[in-house]
């Protein structure tokens, strides 16, 4: 059990048999009446976001999520297959379960799979990944006086904005949290 006073961003709670993650929270102490906690909760299962208000100090069941490090081995139809490298046990996730993470997912990549009651819920990518540029416009010398950017499509199909000097075939480091270019990779 966890008190609504102890909510932090990322806290997982269980409401009506579903797992929700706290995205935003605000402790409100009105001049008249009792204090309460206003939250935005994101469903771990389907990604929907709802606003919910709890009384201050209200006790809720905390969802105990398990993280396991798995390697993405291959795709079979629309399913992504992951393998536990110590037990060689396979776990399958659908494209809907993976969500936006799939734009950075490539075979052989190690990721954390979050499970609840032995049911895989979502994939947590590393904060940055190294990917190859597959498509981008050529950068012309003297295009801008200051650093400009152009769109580039990476080997996984993700699109990020990169500096003008980069060309097709170069490997770059990308931040998976905000889709930003971090630098060149050798």
From Swiss-Prot:
Question: Cellular component terms, GO, for this chain's entry?
Answer: cytoplasm
Q: Where in the cell is it found?
A: Cytoplasm
Which UniProt keywords are listed? Cytoplasm, Elongation factor, Protein biosynthesis
Q: Known SUPFAM superfamilies for this protein?
A: Nucleic acid-binding proteins, Translation proteins SH3-like domain
Instruction: Tell me the GO molecular function terms.
Output: translation elongation factor activity
InterPro entries the UniProt entry points to: Elong-fact-P_C, NA-bd_OB-fold, Rib_uL2_dom2, Transl_elong_fac_P/YeiP, Transl_elong_KOW-like, Transl_elong_P/YeiP_cen, Transl_elong_P/YeiP_CS, Transl_elongation_fac_P
Q: Which Gene3D superfamilies match?
A: 2.30.30.30, Nucleic acid-binding proteins
Provide the family line.
Answer: Belongs to the elongation factor P family.
Q: What is this protein called?
A: Elongation factor P
UniProt source species: Synechococcus sp. (strain CC9902)
């Amino acid at each position: 059990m966890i008190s609504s006073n102890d909510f932090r961003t990322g806290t997982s709670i269980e409401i009506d048999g579903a797992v929700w993650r706290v995205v935003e929270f605000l402790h409100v102490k009105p001049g008249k009446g009792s204090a309460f906690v206003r939250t935005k909760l994101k469903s771990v299962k389907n990604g929907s976001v709802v606003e919910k208000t709890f009384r201050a100090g209200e006790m809720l069941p905390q969802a105990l999520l398990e993280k396991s490090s798995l390697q993405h081995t291959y795709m079979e139809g629309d399913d992504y297959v992951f393998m536990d490298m110590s037990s060689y046990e396979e776990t399958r996730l659908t494209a809907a379960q993976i969500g936006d993470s799939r734009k950075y997912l490539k075979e052989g990549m190690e990721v954390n799979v979050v499970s609840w009651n032995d049911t895989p819920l979502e994939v947590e990518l590393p904060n940055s990944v190294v990917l190859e540029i597959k498509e981008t416009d050529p950068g012309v010398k003297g295009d801008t006086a200051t650093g400009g950017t152009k769109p580039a499509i990476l080997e996984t199909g993700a699109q990020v904005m990169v500096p003008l000097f980069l060309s097709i075939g170069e490997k770059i480091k990308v931040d998976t949290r905000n889709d930003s270019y971090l630098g060149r990779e050798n």
